[in-house]
Structure formats: structure tokens, C-alpha cells
Amino acid sequence: MGLAGAKNKRKLGNDPNNTKWSRNTDTFGQKILRAQGWQPGEYLGAKDAAHAEWHTEANTTHIRVTLKDDTLGLGAKRNNGDECTGLDAFQHLLGRLNGKSDEALEAEQKVRNDVKLSLYIQKKFGMMRFVKGGWLVGDQVKQTPDEEAEEIPDSTETSEAPEPAAVESKKRKADRRSDKEDDKLGKKEKKSKKRKAGSEGDVGGEGGQKEKDKKSKRRKTESDECEEPAVTPKTAESLDEASGASEAGNTKNEKKDKKRDKKEKKERRDKKEKKEKRRIEKAAAESGAETGDSISEEKKRKKKEATSEPSSAPTPTDSNSSTPTGSGYSTPIPTGSSRYLARSRFIAQKKMAFADSAALNQIFMIKS
């Protein structure tokens, strides 16, 4: 309705603290609780419950509800300007300037960090009191300082006990290794017996098999004695050939690089020569056009002077005078911006000077 609507005013003079609603006993909830056997001043819940002994006056007070009108977490409080941000860093800087030791500065910084952490925990989770787990479960603490002193020598005895155990474990490992070696020797003997039996059965190929066995034994002994192969003359020759081939390859690569450099230099020279030729041709064409125009204009001027009647001597004029109207020639003036705009202006001025006889007399310093 806006300003034209009915105005409902509430006066708080009768209830300035707004506690009338909490003292009202005629509400719907009060009636239901009384119907269930509850009376004002009693606790909620079963009277014979196991946790009834923990009930306090807090169970009789009202549940306080606050309106959450921000996006902060539950229990978070806004910064009302109580904390001065950057003060700890400033104090650290002052301590360094005053010549405090690093240990003292670290201790002060640790205290500041602990205070910050406690404030953060208090804002985030509220007040927290840590209790030992034994008390929560119901354990009983029986340990005393005398018992701790008695337990210390027992620990030394237990530390001495593992030494013989370690010796026994070493003996067992040695026995296992000896058993494994015996098994390997037995297997080798069996294999050698089988080979001998096969050699006796094959009468015709006894000599060949013996020679093969001897060769294989020689190869094994040579491989065991010398781990690295000896350098024979053949291997030395092969190494020399490989080195020579590598050197030849290097020389070939160098020659190829030189040829490439020469080709690149020639190409660059050819490009420069072509550019110079083009520039010279352009300059010659421009100069030829200018000379041709000037010659034709002079011829026409002489013909006109011969045919025209003798008149009074021409009055001297400025070099900047316009072109004569009767010449019949006009210099084209470029309208747009071009690359040779300044050049074209210079050429036009030259043409105007050649067309005007008075200007030519002034240029060649001839008195008429």
C-alpha cells in the first residue's frame, strides 16, 4: 500500500527487553508438554535415563537462534576491527632493526603463530578442551615414577637379547647357502655322467665330440680369464679403416659446405647486380623522357618566335610565374599520395622553367 497504507505501530515500552514471549505459559507447546506430564521448571527427557545426572540448568533455558544473513561458516564472526593486520610483520621488522638474534625472533614469531592458530580454531569450532582418551574410555592410570624406573633396566636386557638371535639367523643363512651349493654340484655331476654315457654309445663320433668339448672348454676359460677382448691385428686394421673412413667423411662434408657457401655468395652477387641494373635502367628512362620533353618544347618555342611579329622586349618576371596559356602544354599534377610525389613536383617545375623564356634568361644569366 505504500504511504497510503495502514500504519501498525508497536510500542516496546511495556516489554523493552522482549522477554514477554519467553514468560508466556499459554502457548501451544506449553499445553502439549503439560498434557505429557511436564511441569514448568522440570527438565526435558526421561528422568530415569543413564545421562540424567548430567542435566543442568541449561536444559531448562530456551534454545537461542540467530539469523544467518551472510555466507560465512557456522560460528564464524566478522572482523570488527579488533585485530590490526600486519602488526606482527612490523614488529618482526623492528626486532631485526634493533639487532635481535635470529633465535629470539623465531621464538616471538612462533608465539604469534600459536596465537593466530588458537584464534582461528576458536572462531571456526569454538572453545575446545582436549581430554585424554583413557579418561573417556574409563581406563585407570596405574603407572608411577617408581615403576618407570624399574622398567628401564628391563628394556636394556631386551636390547641385549636380540644379539644371539642375530647370530643364529646368520648361521641359518650360511647353512642354506651350503645346501644350495651342494645341490648345484650334484646336478653338474649328473649332467657330466649323462654326457659320458652318450659319448660311449656313439662310437663313430667320439673324436668329433671330444674336439667340440675341448673347444667349448677353451672358449669358457678364455672368457673367464680375460673379460675384455684383446686387440688383434685384424681389429686394429678395422679400427684404422673406420677412422680413415670417418676422416674421409669429414673432408667430404667440409667440401660440400664450401661449395654451398660459394653458391650462396654467387646468388647474392647476382641479386645485387640485377638490382643495380634495374635501378640504372629506371634512372635512364626517367632522364630520357625529361630530355625529350625539353627538346620538343624548345623547338616549338623557336618556331613560334620566328612566325610571331617583333614585339616589345619581355619584361622580367619571377621564376615562380605560371606557365603561358598559349603553349598548349600542361604538366600533370598527381592528385593522390604516391611514391614519387616530390619527384613529380620537381619535374613539373623544370618543365615550367623551360617553357618560360624569361625564366630561362634568368637561369642562364642572359640580359635581354
UniProtKB/Swiss-Prot annotation:
Composition bias, Basic residues: 187-196, 257-277
Any one Gene Ontology cellular component term annotated for this protein: nucleolus
The keyword Nucleus is assigned to this record: yes
A GO BP annotation: rRNA processing
Subcellular location: Nucleus, Nucleolus
InterPro entries for the chain: G_patch_dom, PINX1
Molecular-function GO terms, alphabetical: nucleic acid binding
Sequence intervals crossing the membrane: none
Pfam families (UniProt xref): G-patch
Top-rank taxon, per record: Eukaryota
Skewed-composition ranges (Polar residues): 15-24
Region Disordered: start-end pairs: 1-24, 144-337
Keyword Nucleus: yes
Comp. bias regions, Basic and acidic residues: 176-186
G-patch domain: residues covered: 25-79
Keywords assigned by UniProt, alphabetized: Nucleus, Ribosome biogenesis, rRNA processing
Assigned protein family: Belongs to the PINX1 family.
Primary role: Involved in rRNA-processing at A0, A1 and A2 sites and negatively regulates telomerase.
Protein's name according to its UniProt entry: Protein PXR1
Species name: Chaetomium globosum (strain ATCC 6205 / CBS 148.51 / DSM 1962 / NBRC 6347 / NRRL 1970) (Soil fungus)
